[in-house]
Amino acid sequence: MASMHEALFSSRLLQVNSSFSFRCALPIISSPAAVSCAIKSTQFFKQRCRTKVRDFSLSSLSRRGFVCRAAEYKFPDPIPEFAEAETEKFRDHMLNKLSKRDLFEDSVDEIVGVCTEIFETFLRSEYGGPGTLLVIPFIDMADTLNERELPGGPQAARAAIKWAQDHVDKDWKEWTGTD
C-alpha cells in the first residue's frame, strides 16, 4: 500500500537541456491501457526534449539550500544618557499622577521609587529604540509593589505603562533624530 501511495504521488524534476527545469507530477493510473499511455507519453516527452529525469523530493530541498531565511535586524544598543533623561521625565510624571489619588495613601514616594528603579534598569540595559519596549518591567513593577504590600500596585503599573507607550518611542526618535 505504501508503494502504491508513493507511486500515485511521485513527482520528477525534468531538466530540459540543463537550462530550464520544471516540476511535473505524473499520477499512475491503475488500468493497463492508461499506464501504457502514460509511459509512452512520458518516453516521447523525454526523447523529444532530450531530458534527464531525476527524483525530486521535498527532503532534498533543505540539502540543496532552497531555505528562505528572514534577514536579522539588530536593534541599537541602549543609550545611558537617554535612559537618565527619560527616567527623570518618568519620575516627574509618576509623582504628579499618583499624588492626585488617595488610593496610594502616604506611600507615593516609595511607589514611585520602586517603579522608577525598575524602569531605569530596563532603559539602561534593554531598551534599544522603537520595537523594544517590553511589558515585562511593568509586570515587575506591579509584582514588586504587591510583594512589598504597597497600595495600588496594579494601578501604578498601569499608569507607568500608559506613560511609556505614549512617550518613550517618541522621545527616542527625537533623541536620535530618526523618523
From Swiss-Prot:
- Provide the phenotype resulting from gene inactivation: Misregulation of photosynthesis-associated nuclear gene expression in response to excess light, and inhibition of photosynthetic electron transport. Defects in embryo development. Dwarf pale plants. The csp41b-2 prin2-2 double mutant is embryo lethal.
**Keyword Transcription on entry:** yes
Transit peptide located at which residues?
1-69
Q: Give the GO molecular function terms.
A: DNA binding
Q: Does the keyword DNA-binding apply?
A: yes
GO BP terms, alphabetized: regulation of gene expression; response to light intensity
The entry describes its oligomerization and partners as: Binds DNA when in complex with CSP41b.
Put simply, this protein is called Protein PLASTID REDOX INSENSITIVE 2, chloroplastic
Biological source species:
Arabidopsis thaliana (Mouse-ear cress)
